[in-house]
Amino acid sequence: MSAKNKSNNKTLAENRKARHDYFIEESMEAGIQLVGTEVKSIRAGKSNLKDSYGEIINGEIFIRNMHISPYEKGNIFNRDPLRDRKLLLHKKEIARLLGYTAQQGYTIVPLSLYLKNGRVKVNLAVAKGKKNYDKRDSMLEKAAKRDIERQMKERFR
């Protein structure tokens, strides 16, 4: 396989709960500012996006509550696992996110961490929280779609 056909994206962590708890309005890619031991820990799969969210402070966007376990061989160079990490976006993109989050009920949620050309990237989403009845509706829709697919598969055998 040639280098052009090979995908350079490798998912390292995924926030599956976000798709269940939120309506995803828009998503975008952002870089993340990390130290060396954090990159090594993320590459080892020791990161968690479960309760993390994005917040805009003084025109900069930070990701909060993203847990990156300390690197085992990192000794004194390890940082706090839950520290705020700066996301790297253009000012126009931050302004667009600020416009969304100024509206009632919208938040910034990380969907996944992945490697792109050797750099760690975050897939961010602007999302609106789901109510319990919305979650039930989406689960029923998924089940109905799965049943239809199963019946179609059996019919065309």
UniProtKB/Swiss-Prot annotation:
One of its GO terms (biological process) is trans-translation. The keyword Cytoplasm applies. This is SsrA-binding protein. SUPFAM superfamilies: Small protein B (SmpB). It comes from Clostridium kluyveri (strain ATCC 8527 / DSM 555 / NBRC 12016 / NCIMB 10680 / K1). GO terms for cellular component: cytosol. Belongs to the SmpB family. It is found in: Cytoplasm.
